[in-house]
């Protein structure tokens, strides 16, 4: 596949809007999501593909102002403290082994991919509905496990903050850049190769993580 470097700060205008316009915002309004909107987000996740249609994902929803939300929010790393303002804090959970009534348990090598596909569907649907959906890996796993009662063979993938967009001006200055800063991605020719991977060309740029997500 031949590509040009393009503009790593700008997606192709022809991309579907749910992909093109998605970003990891951090400002939330306090208003709860209507039940039909909330249901639609998880229905989008439900229809994601998975290996053998195993659907190893689950979602644990906690609502701001409840003990469950407080317990899960306590797992957040300090850099993600802004997520406590989200009306919903969701733990994405995945079953990491195949369970079959007539066979011994076997590790599911594709479980995290399946969970990622389902979570990606949720994020895309949220973007289409004007909902902020921000997935985070910055949390204490032990605290999160205890908060939602997860035990092996289940694992927590990411936490997702969900809610309506809020006022960026109300954010602390050090957090506001996450909301308003540029989105930066590697150019296509650093990601897509014909026939063989070139390790030198595949190395990430030094500034690949700069800007918003």
Residue ranges and their predicted role:
Residues 1-213:
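Acidic, surface-exposed loops and disordered segments
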């Amino acid at each position: 596949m031949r590509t040009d470097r393009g503009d790593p700060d700008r997606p192709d205008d022809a991309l579907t809007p749910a992909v093109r316009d998605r970003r990891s915002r951090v400002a939330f309004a306090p208003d709860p999501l209507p039940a039909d909107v909330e249901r639609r987000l998880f229905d989008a996740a439900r229809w994601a593909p998975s290996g053998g249609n195993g659907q190893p994902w689950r979602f644990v929803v906690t609502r701001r102002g409840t003990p469950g939300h407080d317990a899960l929010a306590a797992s957040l790393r300090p850099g993600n403290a802004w997520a406590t303002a989200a009306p919903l804090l969701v733990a994405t959970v995945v079953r990491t082994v195949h369970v079959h009534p007539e066979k011994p348990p076997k590790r599911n090598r594709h479980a995290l991919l399946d969970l990622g596909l389902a979570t990606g569907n949720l994020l895309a649907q949220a973007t289409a509905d004007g909902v902020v959906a921000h997935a985070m890996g910055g949390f204490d796993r032990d605290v999160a496990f205890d908060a939602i009662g997860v035990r092996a063979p289940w694992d927590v993938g990411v936490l997702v903050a969900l809610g309506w967009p809020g006022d960026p001006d109300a954010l602390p200055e050090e957090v506001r850049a996450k909301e308003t800063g540029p989105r930066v991605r590697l150019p296509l020719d650093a990601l897509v190769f014909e026939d063989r991977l070139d390790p030198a060309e595949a190395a990430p740029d030094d500034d690949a993580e700069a800007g918003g997500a």
